[in-house]
Amino acid sequence: MTHPVVRFAPSPTGRLHVGNVRTALINWMFSRGQQGKFILRIDDTDLERSTAEHEEALKVDLTWLGLTWDDSFSQSHRFANYDAAADKLRALHLLYPCYETAEELDVKRKIAQTRGRPPVYDRAALSLTAQDRADLEAKGRKPHWRFKLSGERVEWNDLVRGPQSIDTASVSDPILIREDGSYLYTLPSVVDDIEAGITHVVRGEDHVTNSGAQIEIFMALGGKAPEMAHTPLLIGADGAALSKRIGSLSMGELRARGYEPMAICSHLAKLGTSDNIEARATLEQLCEEFSFSKIGRAPARFDDNDLNALNAALVHAMPFEAVRERLITLDARAASEPFWLAVRENCTFVADAISWVDMVYGSPAPLVAEEDREFISGAAMYLPEGELTTESWSAWTNALKAATGRKGRGLFMPLRKALTGAEHGPEMSAVLPLIGREKVLQRLS
């Protein structure tokens, strides 16, 4: 295989969310795994909705995820290229003007459906004479422009779906240019793919039906159609569409909630594949494990619980230096290596460490049941002498077990509740030296 050249083409009209990040990630893993090239194309032909702020935000999101790009360009700087391509198609009699209004087209669709025919455009505009067109324009009508499909069957081997074909006689000639002269997605995308040397187009399966027309436009413009891979769309754990949750699943929102970039990437890389959903420490590992052959045909279920589990697994393994600056920002008291190592396995997010600060450095209210009061008040005399270490908890509880006959939960739980004010938490062997002898004695008294 030659080194692939792929592109991720977001529109700067909103924040990146898990759906389009998954597309970016699959493109990135495939290209990087084959020593290829990953291009970021900004699809900003919608000048009214596209903003510089959203473009900057999506670049920040991709950088945060580690999905760096080799080249980048914006479609808004390339209108002359699209105009030239449109002129070429006109010269080939493959781009023709149509004057129907949206209402008239809707009536045509409804009539076709009532007659049991597919709602395919009838190409009435091809019958217009030059005088007909002049008369319509004199009445204020402005044309939209359609690409004339061949009517033949277009075939390709999809890297995910296998052999695919589209009968272009069964679909409408696609509109490439609107009445106001602005371009729809199709023509600029094909022009850019040809000029950027894109070898593989990887996108969601909602684009499958567009592929036949796009392949014919590639051929008409003298280009070679890239290989294609159409991946199943994401759905929620309940099987419902994610569209209503997209705001809460934006990269900005997930980052603010404390998710690690590699948790998100691990989750999205493994969703809908034959691999187990497990955390990976680096993008390079994900690249090594990626293959289109692993992607299934069923919709991929995005489950918050899986994402939380992956995030927790990564947090549990994080060394102190990886989180030091974040802990300082959250609460300087938490920014010590012994504290982090003691609490990290009780954290789903790095910020969860702060919930354990008061247990160690504050004054939590002891929880002492009436039947445990005598045991707790007498426990102090068995506390090992000198500075407390990670070995002190075991020595202390063994001494208490021998002296009182208590064992198991009846021994450990009253001590934990008296010292931390909680029934659950980090390992007491790590917590005891953090609390320190003086505070341990205070909390037992």
From Swiss-Prot:
The keyword Ligase applies. Catalyzes the attachment of glutamate to tRNA(Glu) in a two-step reaction: glutamate is first activated by ATP to form Glu-AMP and then transferred to the acceptor end of tRNA(Glu). Keywords: Aminoacyl-tRNA synthetase, ATP-binding, Cytoplasm, Ligase, Nucleotide-binding, Protein biosynthesis. It is found in: Cytoplasm. This is Glutamate--tRNA ligase 2. NCBIfam families: gltX_bact. One of its GO terms (molecular function) is ATP binding. A motif ('HIGH' region) lies at residues 10-20. Its EC number is 6.1.1.17. It comes from Hyphomonas neptunium (strain ATCC 15444). It catalyses: tRNA(Glu) + L-glutamate + ATP = L-glutamyl-tRNA(Glu) + AMP + diphosphate. Transmembrane segments: none annotated. A motif ('KMSKS' region) lies at residues 241-245. One of its GO terms (biological process) is glutamyl-tRNA aminoacylation. Monomer. Belongs to the class-I aminoacyl-tRNA synthetase family. Glutamate--tRNA ligase type 1 subfamily. GO terms for cellular component: cytoplasm. ATP binds at K244. It comes from the Bacteria. The keyword Protein biosynthesis applies. The lineage of its organism: Bacteria, Pseudomonadati, Pseudomonadota, Alphaproteobacteria, Hyphomonadales.
